[in-house]
Each structure stands twice: as C-alpha cells, then as structure tokens.
C-alpha cells in the first residue's frame, strides 16, 4: 500500500487471505476462477521485464483477483477509503500492516479526504508488428479489436523485423520535468532531461510471514506524487506497458535470494475483443501506483479522473459493473462483501410482491398516445428522478456507504464522469444479484403507479413514462392564460407532491435511505407545445423561453445532428399551422431547410468527420486490408469505431472504412454521401409529415416531399 505521511511517501505491506468463494464472486463464469489458476497466473506475471499480458485471454480471472484482494484487504485490516486520513497499526516483529482505523482527531491528522497528487505522463511507442499476424489475431476472436490483435501478435512474438522498440516519455510534476527518447529501448536514451531519482526511490524491506518465513520486497516509491495521469487521446495501453516494462526489468534485474518479483499485469479495454465503452489503464502489482486515463489533458478532465479513482478506491472503471459491489461492507459471517445484506433482502422480497409487475419487467415504459399527436393548449412538464435505480438499491442495501457517497455527489451535479459508473452498476445488477434487480424493478413500478395517482389528483396527465422519468400535460393550466411564472409554481408543487408520494410508497414498504441520500424528482422543463411520435420519440417546446427537448431523432453523425437541428427549427411552424396560408408558408420553409441541408452536405462531402458514425467493433468486422499496416494507430481501436462509408464506383456496394485508424493525409475513396442523405431525409420527412398530419388532420396531399435523389449528381 502506498501511504502518504506529511509530504513524503512510504510503502506498507499486508498479508491478506483471499478465499476461493470471494474470487469467484466477481466472475461471470465462476468455474474458471480457482485458487490454482490464480496462483499459476500470478507466477506467469512475476517475471522480470515481462510484458504484462498474462490477463490477455484471461481478463475475467484477473479482474476477480483485483476486486477480491481489495475487498479482502478491508476485511483483514478494517474498512477504509483511499485518501482518507488513517492511523496504521504495524506489527514491528513482522513488519506487516495489521490494522487501520480512521484518524478521528486533528492530532492524528483526521479530517476530510485529502486530494490525489498527480504527475502528468505522456508516452508514445513504436512496436513494429507483423500485419499478417495482426489480421490473423483479429480474425480469430469474436470481435476484431485491432488493439487486442496487436497485443496478441506482440505476445506471440510476430515482429515484422528485428528493429527494436522506440519509446518517448515525458513526466511532469510541479517540481520535476523528466524526459527520455529512445530510438531503441536496448540502447541508452539519445535525448534526456531530468533524473529518474527525482521521480522515484527504491524501497526495500524484509517481512516475516507466518511467523517464520522471511521475504524480501522491493518497490518503487514516488517522491512527490501518488498517481500518474495520461490523456486517452495521446497515451495507449501498449505505450504505458512498454514504459513500465523497462522499469520492471531494471528494478528486478539482479536476482536476490528470498526477494519476490512484483506481479506485473495489465487490465484495459484492449483485452476485450469488442473493446469497452470507457478507456482505462489498470496495472495489478507493478508499478504500485495508479495510472489514470483522463478524457483529455485539460485540468477539469484530470480532476474528474482522480475523483473517480478516489471515490471507487481504484475499482472503477476497471471492474465495471462489479466495482461498487466489492466496496460493500463486510459483516463478520460474510463470505463476500454484502452477503448478509443480500440475504436480508431475499427475506424481505415478499413485501414487494415480486411477479405482480410483469408488465414492465425492466422498468415502466408506457405511453397513452396511441398515434402521432401534436398538442397545444395546456402547459406540459417533464420530470426525472436523479440516480433513480442506484438510489432504490440503497433502500435495500443502505450500508453500502461508498455507493451512497457517489449517489449524493451525482444528486448535486458533481463528477459527471461517474454517471456512467452508476448506469453500469445497475445495468449489471441482474447478472450479479437477480433478486435485488427484480426487487428494485418492482419498487420502481410501484412508485410509478403511486406517483401517477397523485399527479392525476392534481390535474396532471402523464403522457409518456420511461423508467425514471415522465412528461405530461396539466389539463387545467392553459398556456395562453396562465403565465410562465405561475406555471412554474404549479410545476414545483406537483414535483414536491409526486416526490412525497414516491417516498410514501417506499416508507410503507418498510425501507429507508442512508443519511443524505434522497429520492430526488427534478423538474426538467416547462413547455407550451408537444409532438409525440412514439414512447421514445417526442419534441417539447416552450414558445416563451425557446427551450426545447427533442428526443428520438437519429443524430449519431454530424450530418444527422445538422438534420435534427433543421427539423427542430421547423417543428414550431408545424405546431402553429392554423390555415392553408400557414401550410403554404410551412411548405416553403421546409423546402428552404432541405436545400440548406443539401448545401451543407455538399460543403462537407469530403469531410469524414461530418459523415462518420460511432459503431461497435463487433458490428464493423469487414475492414480494408491496408488498415493492418497502420502501426500504433491501431492501439486506439479498443472502443467504438468511427466508420465512414466510401464507394469507388457506382456499381459497387459501399465499404466501411475506420478512417481514424489511418494516418494523415487521408486518401479515402469517395464518401457515399447519398447513402447517408437518403436515410436521413427518409426519417426527416417521415417525422415532419406525420406531425403535419396529426396537426391538421390533413390528407396525403398536404405532405411535404423533397426528392433527395434529384441531388445525387452533386455527390458523384
């Protein structure tokens, strides 16, 4: 454990028993995680200067080990949180840490959590691997992450030539600037600045295990920082591996009797054949301090990355949906954290009447509007619960203080990067604890019914309800005679009453929330106009404030976003149509808007960024052969791909090209703009005409037509 004492750092060591039951707790396939397999994997990862690729093809086991050790440590020495002032109990005879407790008084250094101290690292690497090997590795897995294929090729030793690995690294703190550039990592640096001794010292100690076995340990101790932060945009997992591999080889270059080699294993999205939604860099064991991935190099992004690390004790995002389960508290008889609470929930499910809410097995999704509708007259309002499902989880598991802390912060709008952590937590609950998942769904459905009854009593009709939010109409509140200010007063009273109804429902069930956690219903907006196409597709608009909420138009590309903005600008005209003159004006406006879209598309016809869409790796496996030759650019291919469709000849089918995986200057075939425009205009005109028909009870002759095929010549 890396510990900060004043302005200095030290290392403490603890001997922690980890049960096979706990190791299996974090695994989808528990049969693959056994103590014997874990011991074998650890031995493979403890070779001086090895590539940290033992988890490649075995990431589930290593994630179980990482989470299990973190949880077991807290059982062994006492519950604690990262960056929390602590009092350490050390056995002076063995040299081992045996107890931890919060530093309660100022004299012991107590108080609020302290902040991480970051060193900014930027590292790039060139590893010349065989393109044929990369292609073969990509083809052999269910998914074709090219970053993973590169790691497989590296592990198997398929180098294109004997040219060595080139490495460039810069590490900056407030006190130190360190730089090295190696044309070959086997040779001294040809450019250098600063000294490694300014960053780290080597700490060695002898420990006594089991009362008699002596074991030597050797670790790197940072001098002025406790985490390394890298930008996802510039530092790949392979680059970090190459850097730390050199450090690992140097630290353990001399074999000493009874001194153990530190485990060196990498966890990251590159290990998944289909990539992962969040980029992260997690090393189990060496170098002994975290490497955090920030979304960019801005100060705010760095702070968000450090906050996510601190609030999850380093388990998010590496452990995904399991992270906050490993942070649950231990009861004395538990085999895994939170086991006793889980049993109590199983004993209380009769209160929730599971099985009676089968209409909404994944949470309420309903819409009373059976067809397209254009609505005006009353005020409309939209409401949404904050961190709804994790909050309901805390009704069942109120002792999970680490999850409660994140829910409280998100309720205050802090740390937006943790929103995905909460979404992942509940999304995976049905796999980790199906009874708890079904219980929470039953609770949420019961809340929706109680809430709906309450707002109906106050003259508000819910039009659409989706899981944790809803919108509807205040039938006794006409927007042409009730001011916006008065409508806000009504909406706030309605919000408060609905929230009280929700709290009343859970209280009657016998549940209560942890201190500081609330079931918060938020007013998302007040609107004068509403158009509904379906449960998940609607447009809400306020004529007075110009505020809008447009949900459901496909806007994954720049072209799609431009079309959505164009349609959004037309919908107020649709809502205002009263006679044939208005309809004529609308038709002219639509044609002008469509022509502007075409003109904008023409201006961007050669810009892949405007047309490309983010596509799952598993959905874009047909790749151009040239992509496998693009070296370190492929190390970025561990999440969704930016795909653009190109066509060389009119007679052939469009080809998907992952254009961000090619170096500049890009030499693409002709972007198949018409494929995109045809789909976009089909949706655009369909939604527009359905809204017109709903607004005017018009026949098809009133529909707007714009033959996009007439403009195909512009894009050939």
From Swiss-Prot:
Keywords tagged on the record: DNA replication, Host nucleus, Transferase
A Pfam family: Herpes_HEPA
GO MF term list: transferase activity
Claim: Transferase is one of the keywords in the record: yes
Signal peptide: none
Gene Ontology cellular component list: host cell nucleus
InterPro entries the record matches: HSV_HEPA (IPR004996)
Cellular localization per UniProt: Host nucleus
Keyword Transferase annotated: yes
GO biological process, alphabetically ordered: DNA replication; viral genome replication
Role description: Component of the helicase/primase complex. Unwinds the DNA at the replication forks and generates single-stranded DNA for both leading and lagging strand synthesis. The primase synthesizes short RNA primers on the lagging strand that the polymerase presumably elongates using dNTPs. The primase-associated factor has no known catalytic activity in the complex and may serve to facilitate the formation of the replisome by directly interacting with the origin-binding protein and the polymerase.
Protein family per UniProt: Belongs to the herpesviridae HEPA family.
Subunit structure: Associates with the primase and the helicase to form the helicase-primase complex. Interacts with the origin-binding protein. Interacts with the polymerase catalytic subunit.
Protein name: DNA helicase/primase complex-associated protein
């Amino acid at each position: 454990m890396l510990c900060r004492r004043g302005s200095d750092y030290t290392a403490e060591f603890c001997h922690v028993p980890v049960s096979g039951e706990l190791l299996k707790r974090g695994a989808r396939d528990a049969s693959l995680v056994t103590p014997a397999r874990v011991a074998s994997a650890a031995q493979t990862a403890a070779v001086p200067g090895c590539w940290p690729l033992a988890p490649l093809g075995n990431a589930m086991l290593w994630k179980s080990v990482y989470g299990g050790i973190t949880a077991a440590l807290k059982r062994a020495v006492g519950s604690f949180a990262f960056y929390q002032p602590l009092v350490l109990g050390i056995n002076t005879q063995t040299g081992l840490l045996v107890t931890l407790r919060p530093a309660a008084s100022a004299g012991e250094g107590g108080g609020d959590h302290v902040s991480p101290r970051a060193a900014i690292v930027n590292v790039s690497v060139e590893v010349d691997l065989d393109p044929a090997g990369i292609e073969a590795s990509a083809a052999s897995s269910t998914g074709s992450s090219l970053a993973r294929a590169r790691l497989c090729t590296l592990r198997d030793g398929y180098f294109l030539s004997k040219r060595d690995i080139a490495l460039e690294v810069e590490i900056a703190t407030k006190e130190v600037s360190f730089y090295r550039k190696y044309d070959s990592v086997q040779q001294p640096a040809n450019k250098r600045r600063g000294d490694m001794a300014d960053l780290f010292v080597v700490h060695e100690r002898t420990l006594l295990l089991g009362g008699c076995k002596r074991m030597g340990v050797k670790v790197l101790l940072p001098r002025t920082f406790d985490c390394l932060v890298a930008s996802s945009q510039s530092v790949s997992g392979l680059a970090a591996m190459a850097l730390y591999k050199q450090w690992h080889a140097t630290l353990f270059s001399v074999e000493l009797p009874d001194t153990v080699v530190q485990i060196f294993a990498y966890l990251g999205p590159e290990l998944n054949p289909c990539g992962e939604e969040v980029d992260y860099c997690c090393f189990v064991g060496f170098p002994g301090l975290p490497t955090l991935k920030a979304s960019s190099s801005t100060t705010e992004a760095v702070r968000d990355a450090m906050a996510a690390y601190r609030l999850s004790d380093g388990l998010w995002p590496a452990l995904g949906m399991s992270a906050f389960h490993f942070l649950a508290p231990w009861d004395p008889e538990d085999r895994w954290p939170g086991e006793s609470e889980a049993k109590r929930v199983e004993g209380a499910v009769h209160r929730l009447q599971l099985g009676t809410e089968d209409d909404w097995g994944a949470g309420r999704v309903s819409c009373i509007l059976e067809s397209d509708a254009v609505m005006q007259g009353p005020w409309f309002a939209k409401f949404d619960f904050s961190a709804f499902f994790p909050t309901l989880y805390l009704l069942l598991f109120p002792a999970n203080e680490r999850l409660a802390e994140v829910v409280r912060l998100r309720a205050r709008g802090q740390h937006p990067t943790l929103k995905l952590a909460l979404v992942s937590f509940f999304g995976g609950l049905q796999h980790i604890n199906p009874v708890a998942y079904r219980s929470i769904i039953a609770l949420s459905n019961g809340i929706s019914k109680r809430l709906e009854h309450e707002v109906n009593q106050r003259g508000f009709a819910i039009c659409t309800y989706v899981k944790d939010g809803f919108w509807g109409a205040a039938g006794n509140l006409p927007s042409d005679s009730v001011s916006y200010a008065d409508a806000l007063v009504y909406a706030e009273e309605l919000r408060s009453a609905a929230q009280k109804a929700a709290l009343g429902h859970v209280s009657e069930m016998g549940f209560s929330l942890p201190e500081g956690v609330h079931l918060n219903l938020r007013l998302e907006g007040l609107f004068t106009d509403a158009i509904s196409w379906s449960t998940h597709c609607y447009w809400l608009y306020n004529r007075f404030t110009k505020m809008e909420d447009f949900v459901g138009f496909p806007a994954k590309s720049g072209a799609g976003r431009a079309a959505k903005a164009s349609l959004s600008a037309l919908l107020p005209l649709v809502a205002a149509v009263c006679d044939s003159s208005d309809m004529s004006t609308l038709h002219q406006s639509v044609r002008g808007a469509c022509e502007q879209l075409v003109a904008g598309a023409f201006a961007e016809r050669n810009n892949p960024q405007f047309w490309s869409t983010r596509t799952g790796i598993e959905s874009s496996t047909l790749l151009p052969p040239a992509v496998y030759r693009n070296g370190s650019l492929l190390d970025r291919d561990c999440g969704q791909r930016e795909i653009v469709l190109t066509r060389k000849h009119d007679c052939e089918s469009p080809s998907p090209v992952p254009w961000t995986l090619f170096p500049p200057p890009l030499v693409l075939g002709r972007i198949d703009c018409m494929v995109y425009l045809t789909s976009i205009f089909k949706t655009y005109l369909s939604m527009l005409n359905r809204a017109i028909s709903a607004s005017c009870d018009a026949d098809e002759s009133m529909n707007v037509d714009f033959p996009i095929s007439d403009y195909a010549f512009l894009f050939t």
